[in-house]
């Protein structure tokens, strides 16, 4: 049998032990704990990166369950937006023989579907991938109440109605507005392209580019403006591709990128030709300034200096005028019918007829970096009609900051959220293409995917009471009765309107569920959502819900790498959820995810570690089974008369491990959970055996404590182990001993062994003599007595009091001089005792401890040990000598 067959046998055995369960969470007398995770987008199967973030929420859900909470962890499926519709459209074009930049057909076939034709319908994606996602996460052992799952978009009448209610309320609160705005735009999709719609260029925004006008023959050459007063460097040659275009009977020359953006920002721009500008620039270049100096570097390179005071002042005035024109032209109105005052007194509908320019400057917007949409379109900046959420509202921001002040999250996450609150501005939420909910009062537009996904956590609390399936086809509450009044009653506490009296019992149950489970106690997310979704999550909650329903905690994590490299299907360094679970099983996969990382730094899933976890978990289980046989053979009435020092060491150490593991759970540091629940517990058993520990019941306690602590990490396996071998209720272990006497003693033994091994004399000698002392030297006793009389802090803070330290060292100098002790050595001892007094307190009998563990010292050092007391030795500082 080869290595792979061995691993497969062990994995199959572990799989056979794992016991899953069906999760249903309803109102109870227990305190609740509500955990949510951003619903995944349904344009494919889940991959390991999804699982890494989901695991953070899942581990906490099981932990809170052990703490006695009634835990609700739901999950839905996001289908809103452009990606699904764009992929379906591209697939149709590809099947018709049209050329596409990426083969959607190949993507779908790689997901395991031979018949791709059904995927030309966006609805087919929505009906396919949520079910596969549920199957994957059930195999993973996720603690999810699947009754509460749903899909988004207007396919689901209930969620569609809920989102419309949300936006009616935002409009009523004055947080929505309509107008034109420069936005990243995809010419292929013919609509705005925001972060989630992009293949490349997330967080890239439009930037204004001010162009300077130069007259070249009969055309105006547009050159990017430098700082005012700085020279312009004009370069023409083979590499400079420009576009000749006409606007209002004036001919212009500009870089292609400028033209490609400008034509989406003003009307009446007529393309003439593309050409390479290669000429003698000085020949035919004219300029309207009062004082210009031209320096020719080469035939096609020159520097134009226009830095006279009068020119600079003129330019500053013109740029200020540009700003004023833009501010006036693009002021937002609160309805699509509104008229905006401008310098030219133009209506909103006609602002694209005006080129924003002055005598010497033109204003145009371009993306600050390249943006490519998921459709493959190279994006530009367009001046678009848009509905906006006014996240720039200062009163609203103030409420969000209050929410964040009281919200638990990591320091780097908090810092990014505060920064986000400050910089976030108006957010365009209307779309013309894709899937989603139509804006109720302007149905030509859809609500974007980042705006319909901010308060759906509230929908989880009542979904299972309204309909049974994902799409709202299996109705409990009739969909034809859905209205804002329904949601007002459930979520806003308003009175029930008479038309709904017949559904009072059901709707009251919905309201009670919301009031019981809300607010969100923990929101887990990838760090990439800090700058958008998590901001909007807080903004919308403080706008639409009472303060008692504001979120309590946010946890974010970094991206997941695979074997130290970025996951990528194109390079083959990729692992889907299903493939990971097939290769490593749920328990090893979950353990490996737990140790990957706990911060916003990128984490690393190492497949070799996952394989090792199969072996380690298998060994762990087998040790429990062997120990269980021995425990069953012992008399049920057998009691422990007294504990040996080895027993006390075990009890103290397992107590420390339990405490550290519980602290790690609370901090969501799951790598430390595995360290103290698994590795340190296994190490403890090995140590206990090495120091001749024999108490089977105490060994069993270690394994039981470890299994209880590991339940949130490996629930399906630990469920079986607890029920079968420990006959125990599902709860968290408690520390058995809160002392650390034997831990301190054994740390001393371990350090002693290290000193023996580090000695140069150890190599060629077979015997080590350890001489211990009972008393400190007289000069040290005097210093102890002197310092103990001083009333001062006994920690590192005291070092900052330079005057006090100088006085203290002066007072001990006579003691050191009398005993002929080196002043530096003596001062170091004084500072050590001043800051670390516990270090010099004897917590155990040094001679007895060494004598008891002498066999262990001999085994570890491979030397015969001789122990004696010696007057020259001091407590905790034995004299070590070697002999043949």
From Swiss-Prot:
<dbReference type="GO" id="GO:0005524">
    <property type="term" value="F:ATP binding"/>
</dbReference>
<keyword id="KW-0963">Cytoplasm</keyword>
<feature type="binding site">
    <location>
        <position position="569"/>
    </location>
    <ligand>
        <name>ATP</name>
    </ligand>
</feature>
<protein>
    <recommendedName>
        <fullName>Probable leucine--tRNA ligase, cytoplasmic</fullName>
        <ecNumber>6.1.1.4</ecNumber>
    </recommendedName>
</protein>
<keyword id="KW-0030">Aminoacyl-tRNA synthetase</keyword>
<dbReference type="GO" id="GO:0004823">
    <property type="term" value="F:leucine-tRNA ligase activity"/>
</dbReference>
<feature type="short sequence motif" description="'HIGH' region">
    <location>
        <begin position="40"/>
        <end position="50"/>
    </location>
</feature>
<keyword id="KW-0547">Nucleotide-binding</keyword>
<keyword id="KW-0648">Protein biosynthesis</keyword>
<feature type="short sequence motif" description="'KMSKS' region">
    <location>
        <begin position="566"/>
        <end position="570"/>
    </location>
</feature>
<keyword id="KW-0436">Ligase</keyword>
<dbReference type="InterPro" id="IPR009080">
    <property type="entry name" value="tRNAsynth_Ia_anticodon-bd"/>
</dbReference>
<dbReference type="GO" id="GO:0006429">
    <property type="term" value="P:leucyl-tRNA aminoacylation"/>
</dbReference>
<dbReference type="InterPro" id="IPR002300">
    <property type="entry name" value="aa-tRNA-synth_Ia"/>
</dbReference>
<dbReference type="InterPro" id="IPR014729">
    <property type="entry name" value="Rossmann-like_a/b/a_fold"/>
</dbReference>
<keyword id="KW-0067">ATP-binding</keyword>
<comment type="similarity">
    <text>Belongs to the class-I aminoacyl-tRNA synthetase family.</text>
</comment>
<dbReference type="InterPro" id="IPR001412">
    <property type="entry name" value="aa-tRNA-synth_I_CS"/>
</dbReference>
<dbReference type="GO" id="GO:0005737">
    <property type="term" value="C:cytoplasm"/>
</dbReference>
<dbReference type="InterPro" id="IPR004493">
    <property type="entry name" value="Leu-tRNA-synth_Ia_arc/euk"/>
</dbReference>
<dbReference type="Pfam" id="PF00133">
    <property type="entry name" value="tRNA-synt_1"/>
</dbReference>
